[in-house]
């Protein structure tokens, strides 16, 4: 039986403050939070969805956000299907989540083979609906995360686990305008959406339809003061000639390892901003924020928050808190937590000179003749080269060592033309001075760009 819940997203937004002066701003539309909590974009009365499992498969962040405000507290379960996930997985996700309603603005998704009988298309506008919603249920929020078999894993959260860190902070919101490079169907973007919604601030959401330059211009025009993204998001933003069109007071980086190069570069571009990097994951939730301007984190960070238990075990960070997901859906899914209720993040760390440093993902190691190489460690060195904008280190198959290290490198715009061979040689010398021999790339490929997924992370393909 679905548990009653005195708090819903809608009621929490109402409690957060004045609703008529705060906005949710999309790519092509905007609305006040007041309009959103008293309206709906769904083509049915909200009560018709009571107790149902609703799968959101949309192309538009604004309308997905508006739907969540309606559905939390009414639906039994809401599944966020990110637009970058192939529709080939739609039937699997729908079946695993026991979805019986599909809400979409995508005709291809509506016509796909998914086994869902009730399909609702979005309205283009927010329509006022009756305020009395009846009893509020504790809705399960289902977030998709990558799986080793190719099928996504479905992590189960509640509003309480997702919003815990937002409820922890109540800033003076009058002058704050949040934004994020993330998509709100992913944990990083959803966290910022909830933070803005529950702390009384406006939010400008990004769109996959607009280039980085256009988003920066739009964010600047709306006076964004607080903004988040992955290190890859920020490297791409800094390559844009319009990076200076935003003047943030606060910058947050998360989702990937934050190296010293990107911290320094962002600080140089935005010297008046407070810069933090955050450890968070879909399964573990928000762990901690680091604000001292240095990569890595001090050991005391593991015990700073009494609500969050963290430990390093076998070189991997593990977390136990009320912010973690409860389980994965699906009878064949792995356990999300161990027997002590800790989430194994899969992120490896190393203690050096009194500070912990993230070294990479446990499942992303390159094996070079029996020696382990974390791609992120090599990238951190390459990214410190003064002429490098960003890099991607990967494995190349070798009949002798099993694998070799190679790197794709994007250069910063140069003042003068330099020979490609000279640049490659310079980067290799830079690596040789900093890394053990087996970690030095055997080849440097100069490329115009690197692929960044909708998650904001570099797309890594293992050899």
Which stretches of residues belong to each language-model region?
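Conserved AMP-binding A3 loop
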Residues: 32, 140-167
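Conserved ATP/PPi-binding loop(s) of AMP-dependent carboxylate-activating enzymes
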Residues: 311-341, 371-373
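Gly/Ser/Thr-rich phosphate-binding loop
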Residues: 226, 238-297
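AMP-binding/adenylate-forming catalytic domain of the ANL superfamily
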Residues: 435-457
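Conserved AMP-binding/adenylation subdomain of ANL enzymes
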Residues: 163-177, 185-226
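Conserved AMP-binding/adenylate-forming core of the ANL superfamily
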Residues: 2, 11, 17-48, 90-91, ...
């Amino acid at each position: 039986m679905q548990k009653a819940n005195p708090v819903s997203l809608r009621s929490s937004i109402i409690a957060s403050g004045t609703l008529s002066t705060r906005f949710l701003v999309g790519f092509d539309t905007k609305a006040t939070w007041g309009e959103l909590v008293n309206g709906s974009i769904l083509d049915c009365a909200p009560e018709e969805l009571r107790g149902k499992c609703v799968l959101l498969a949309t192309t538009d962040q604004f309308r997905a956000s508006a739907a969540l405000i309606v559905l939390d507290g009414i639906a039994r379960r809401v599944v966020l299907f990110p637009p970058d996930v192939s529709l080939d997985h739609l039937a699997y996700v729908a079946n695993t989540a026991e979805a019986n309603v599909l809400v979409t603005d995508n005709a291809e998704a509506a016509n796909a083979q998914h086994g869902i009988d009730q399909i609702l298309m979005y309205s283009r506008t927010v329509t006022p609906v009756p305020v009395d919603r009846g009893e509020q249920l504790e809705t399960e929020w289902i977030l998709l995360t990558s799986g080793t078999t190719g099928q996504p894993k479905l992590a189960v959260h509640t509003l309480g686990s997702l919003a815990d860190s937002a409820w922890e902070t109540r800033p003076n919101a009058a002058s704050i305008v949040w934004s994020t490079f993330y998509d709100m169907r992913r944990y990083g973007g959803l966290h910022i959406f909830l933070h803005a919604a529950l702390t009384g601030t406006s939010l400008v959401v990004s769109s996959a339809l607009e280039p980085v330059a256009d988003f920066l211009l739009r964010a600047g025009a709306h006076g964004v003061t607080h903004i988040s993204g992955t290190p890859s998001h920020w490297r791409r933003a800094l390559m844009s000639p319009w990076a200076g069109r935003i003047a943030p007071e606060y910058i947050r980086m998360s989702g990937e390892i934050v190296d010293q190069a990107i911290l320094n570069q962002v600080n140089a571009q935005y010297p008046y901003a407070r810069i933090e990097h955050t450890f968070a994951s879909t399964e573990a939730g928000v762990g901690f924020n680091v604000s001292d301007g240095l990569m890595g984190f001090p050991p005391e960070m593991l015990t700073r928050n009494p609500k969050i238990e963290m430990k390093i075990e076998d070189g991997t960070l593990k977390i136990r808190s009320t912010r973690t997901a409860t389980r994965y859906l699906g009878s064949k899914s792995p356990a999300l937590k161990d027997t002590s209720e800790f989430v194994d993040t899969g992120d490896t760390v190393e203690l050096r000179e009194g500070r912990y440093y993230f070294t990479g993902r446990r499942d992303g190691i390159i094996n070079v003749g029996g020696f382990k190489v974390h791609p992120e460690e090599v990238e951190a060195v390459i990214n410190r080269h003064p002429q490098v904008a960003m890099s991607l280190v990967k494995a190349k198959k070798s009949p002798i060592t099993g694998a070799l290290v190679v790197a794709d490198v994007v250069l910063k715009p140069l003042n003068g033309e330099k020979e490609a061979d000279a640049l490659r040689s310079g980067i290799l010398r830079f690596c040789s001075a900093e890394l053990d021999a087996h970690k030095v790339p055997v080849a440097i490929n100069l490329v115009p760009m690197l692929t960044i997924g909708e998650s904001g992370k570099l797309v890594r393909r293992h050899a």
